[in-house]
Design a protein with these regions (language model features):
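Positively charged n-region of N-terminal signal peptides that target proteins for export
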Residues: 1-5
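Repetitive helical segments and hydrophobic/amphipathic motifs
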Residues: 11-12
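Glycoside hydrolase catalytic-domain context in secreted enzymes
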Residues: 20-613
Length: 613
């Protein structure tokens, strides 16, 4: 019996040992990349360990859910889809629109991404195109067209740094700026976002601006690749210009447009956004030759390429899935799909499953995205600057930018003004921060009114004068001179396209003409200030005014205008585009082979100063 019992025990032990030997050995816990590794080594590790689903998620940029919860990605969806990026579109702001509410929103989305299966932090994007312009009471700088008139590289660097400083305060990590295109047809609603018509000036400004914008761990985005300012009237939205077709030869691309992006690449820009427009009939979002062969290949761009907002809708394809597959295969790495992010995610996976998107294409996209995330420090705990909006430095830089952007076009001995003069200040742009700042200010389209901190032109004169400031035309006999602030309505993208450039046209105000006609016979000096992104036609009214200043869209710091008009500083700005005499000249630029400066109301580069005015 003992022998039998012993035998049973031996058999039982053997069975246990056998079972243990055949149990799968537990996998060691997956280790994350070591801090001592190079970025290249860290990214390679991720590419080897991420699932295809996690990789697809990294290629998606969704919009944060709106305050009413109707659209956009929730925190839960950010986690479950392993989303690589979140954006706030123009005007999509958290409740309260304060630094604290922005920071809380950004942190919530970051924490949601860290809870995903990959644990990779999101990169958070925002349109801060002339300061942190969605945030109430931020510093609003002049739009690009005015900065092109100033043509000061060091000033561009300072503006970039101050913009990055305010953007970083709110937890953002990606800025959809700068726009580095050139302008041809000045009726385009995005004229003010360009750097004018001279590629040499643009190249002079792009590098310093990007270097400044990428301060404080922010990734800048050069846009919109490529040639979006050269679209032909009638081919765009609503039969006008925006998102239209540009007829550009290979030689023009190589000589004029692509060098601007090479400047951005050489400055280390982290991202490039593709244009809604087409080149020679081919939508840029499906132009594999320009995106993959030229931009990533010949030009050696190492950052990631992002689509524009829902731009895949315009790509050729029988359905949304086909459009996404075509877009990814063209070389776009991150898809800005604010509301269809889930469909875009599934489309990438479907393309992979059907062998219509190769794994190498997905790995290239994710590698680029992760490289940028490492380069700007997203895998580390955020090191945010203290909240300090509209601080002394940012206001000083903005005021300088306004001063240097002003272009004096006419002066019949009426400028500089004396601070002892009594003045009449009139016009739609005289006391309106919204008009003064233009589109992309607080909301996508911008808005009339004084809804954010700043100094209007009227307030600037009131602050600086020793005389009396009047605001009613009935007081004409009380004043020494009249300042009439002509203006264009705030607008963005195709909403700003105009059929003509008349003062009372689609984007103008009837009040512009009414005031000029009312002032046509007065016996005191009349000085016009133009607040406009486009050169509104002044040919019929130039003789009405004794002085004419092009102020473009100066932003919130109106004191920069009085600094120069009172003679504390001289004019420096020069026209960044050709100012047409008639509408037929609206597409003429200084690059035209037979360009004659005498043909125009004011030629490219024109700008007076006090000694020669």
């Amino acid at each position: 019996m003992k022998k039998l019992l012993t035998l049973c025990v031996i058999i039982l032990i053997a069975m246990v040992l056998y079972a243990c030997q055949n149990e799968p050995t537990p996998e060691p816990e997956m280790t994350k990349p070591d801090d001592a590794w190079t970025i290249e080594e860290k990214v390679a590790w991720w590419i080897n360990h991420l699932t295809i689903e996690e990789k697809a998620g990294q290629m998606i940029q969704a919009e944060r859910t709106t305050n009413n919860g109707v659209s956009g990605a929730t925190l839960f969806e950010t986690t479950s889809y392993n989303l690589g990026s979140i954006l706030n579109g123009g005007g999509n702001v958290p409740v309260g629109n304060t630094v604290t509410s922005w920071l809380n929103m950004a942190n919530n989305y970051r924490q949601a991404s860290l809870k995903s299966t990959s644990g990779i932090p999101i990169i958070y994007g925002v349109d801060a195109v002339h300061g942190h312009n969605n945030l109430v009471n931020s510093t609003i700088f002049p739009h690009n067209i005015g900065l092109a008139a100033a043509n000061n590289p060091e000033l561009m660097r300072l503006i970039g740094e101050q913009t990055a400083y305010e953007v970083a305060q709110t937890g953002m990590s990606m800025n959809f700026s700068p726009s580095i295109g050139l302008i041809k047809d000045k009726r385009w609603g995005r004229t003010y976002e360009t750097l004018g018509e001279n590629p040499e000036v643009a190249k002079n400004l792009i590098g310093p601006y990007i270097e400044g914008l990428q301060s404080y761990h922010i990734a800048a985005t050069a846009k919109h690749f490529v040639g979006d300012g050269y679209t032909v009237f009638g081919t765009g939205m609503d039969g006008r210009l925006d998102r239209g077709n540009a007829n550009i030869t290979e030689e023009e691309l190589l000589d004029i447009h692509l060098p601007l992006y090479q400047e951005a690449i050489d400055a280390g820009v982290k991202s490039i956004m593709i244009s809604y427009s087409s080149i020679n009939g081919v939508r840029m979002h499906q132009n594999k030759h320009l995106i993959t062969d030229i931009l990533k290949g010949d030009m050696q761009f190492k950052g990631f390429i992002i689509s524009d907002y829902e731009a895949t809708n315009d790509v050729s394809g029988s359905n949304f899935e086909d459009k996404i597959i075509r877009t990814v295969n063209a070389g776009i790495d991150m898809l800005m799909e604010p509301n269809k992010f889930d469909q875009a995610y599934r489309a990438i996976l479907a393309g992979y499953d059907k062998n219509e998107i190769e794994l190498s294409r997905i790995n290239d996209a994710v590698s680029r995205i992760l490289t940028v995330k490492y380069e700007i420090g997203l895998f580390d705990e955020p090191d945010l600057p203290d909240a300090d909006l509209r601080n002394e430095t940012s206001l000083s830089v903005a005021r300088q930018a306004v001063r240097e952007s002003l272009v004096l076009l006419k002066n019949d001995g009426v400028l500089p003004l004396s601070k002892d003069q009594d003045l009449l200040i009139l016009g739609p742009g005289s006391h309106n921060i919204g008009i003064q700042s233009g589109g992309w200010t607080i909301t996508w389209q911008g808005q009339e009114g004084n809804s954010t901190e700043g100094t209007t032109i009227l307030e600037a004169f009131q602050a600086e004068t020793n005389g009396t400031i009047y605001t009613s035309i009935d007081d004409l006999d009380q004043v020494d001179a009249v300042i009439v602030v002509l203006a264009e309505k705030p607008a963005a993208e195709w909403f700003g396209d105009s059929d003509d450039l008349s003062l009372n046209g689609r984007t103008g105000y009837q009040e512009n003409i009414d005031l000029l006609e009312a002032l046509s016979d007065v016996d005191i000096p009349v000085i016009a200030i133009m607040i406009s992104g486009k050169p509104l036609l002044m040919t019929d009214y130039l003789e009405v005014v004794d002085g004419f200043i092009m102020a473009f869209l100066p932003g919130t710091e109106g004191l920069g205008i009085t600094d120069v008009m009172y003679g504390d500083y001289n004019f420096k700005g020069q026209l960044p585009y050709t100012y047409p005499k008639v509408l037929a000249q609206v597409t003429h630029t200084m690059l035209d082979p037979n360009y004659d400066p005498d043909d125009y109301l004011f030629p490219y580069g024109f700008g007076l100063t006090y000694p020669d005015a």
